[in-house]
């Protein structure tokens, strides 16, 4: 694995931490990556904390993960290995904060993978601190679309972040939000190169006026709803 980079904490307030701490049997590594999750129609910021410690190989996810999040372990491991990187053979703990809110969906795959590799590779932590990262991973390392990229982009802007990395298929939706740079990613390797070797992702721009002007008209109304007469009358 080589010698990890020296300990460094970004004093600019970026929500990212890279640290090396003396450990009884070796080295302990910690990385923190920001992503987002959706509850209903609203999104909130989630901190993905990845801790890699010496010990028997193990992988634990905490922070009220639902089934799809627990299953991310196998997707992340295969995506990392099939992208040409080494998956750590150590004791890994992934914490999704805030821990009191249930986490669901597959959008945590990409930030978890970036966190694992940020703790063991030389990535630009100053840049990492500027981004929210979200996306599902296929076993070969491709970044697949997720639900809720629009409210996630809104949450990023409201939290003061100016950049977000999303799956390529979600880029136009997220780019509707003004005041934030949206970077579409097609593979895990592209994201890692973006932080290790310099900008590898290009921000996408959306012509909002054209997008809304060309949207198909909505022809549905309450007459299409069978029953629920009292509810329809109340809404009217």
Residue map of PLM features:
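Peripheral, non-AAA+ core regions of ATP-driven protein-machinery
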Residues: 2-7, 11-236
């Amino acid at each position: 694995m080589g010698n990890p980079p020296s300990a460094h904490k970004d004093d600019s307030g970026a929500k990212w931490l890279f640290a090396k701490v003396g450990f009884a049997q070796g080295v302990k590594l910690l990385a923190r990556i920001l992503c987002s999750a959706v509850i209903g129609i609203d999104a909130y910021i989630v901190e993905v904390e990845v801790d890699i410690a010496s010990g028997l190989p193990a992988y634990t996810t905490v922070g009220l993960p639902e089934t799809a999040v627990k299953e991310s372990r196998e997707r992340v491991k295969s995506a990392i290995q099939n992208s040409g990187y080494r998956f750590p053979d150590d004791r890994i703990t992934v914490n999704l904060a805030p821990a009191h809110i249930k986490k669901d969906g597959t959008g945590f795959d990409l930030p978890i993978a970036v966190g694992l590799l940020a703790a063991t590779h030389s990535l630009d932590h100053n840049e990492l601190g500027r981004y929210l990262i979200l996306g599902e991973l296929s076993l070969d390392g491709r970044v697949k679309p997720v639900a809720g990229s629009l409210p996630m982009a809104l949450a990023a802007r409201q939290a003061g972040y100016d950049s977000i990395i999303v799956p390529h298929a979600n880029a136009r939706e997220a780019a509707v939000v003004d005041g934030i740079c949206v970077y579409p990613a097609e593979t895990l390797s592209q994201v890692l190169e973006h932080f290790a070797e310099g900008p590898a992702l290009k921000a996408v721009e959306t012509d909002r006026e054209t997008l809304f002007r060309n949207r198909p008209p909505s022809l549905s109304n309450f007459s299409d709803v069978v029953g629920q007469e009292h509810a329809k009358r109340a809404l009217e």
